[in-house]
Amino acid sequence: QPDAVVFAGDIYDRSVPPVEAVALFDDFMTQLRAALPNGEIMLISGNHDSAQRLDVFRSELSDRGIHMIGNPPMQKGETIERVTLTDDFGAVNFYLLPFVRPGMVRLVTGTKENGDNLSYPEAFSRLLALSPLNPDERNVLVSHQFFLPDGGDAENIERAENEVKQVGNLDAIPASLIADFDYGALGH
């Protein structure tokens, strides 16, 4: 039996899903919890989800081992949500970082000197710096961004039909920014 189940977004395919989709997800989560009564369930929002809707009951669900994270850190003092599991080899830290747009996190990451939002890589890098990793433990990033291998050409990456392509692929984040993690559970 697994110790955890991780969903790296999207939960739904649109920000306001149909009632049937919400009911289906509710049924799925009920069955998953029944099948995994003592395991941790971790979910983050993706670019198609409504982060605010997924954050409803966040604290209550977390107390029950269901970590459904809609919004990234958006206020000063907030950090990336971390869930720590332990096994015979020590701690495994899961850092739950939902889909991020630089404007969403400007109160946490700051802005450029002229007041403009940071680039996607700059904002993402500053968010990661909020939660320093312990190199003596295993660290897993759960994220839903558009990562590219260093030197990769975003023009050659196929995207889903309903996915908005940023002009010049400004949303691309170099994979080197997550090199300190032992594993990346990356959604899309």
Identify the function of each model-found stretch.
Residues 1-7, 11-186:
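Extended recognition/assembly regions associated with phosphoester-bond processing machinery
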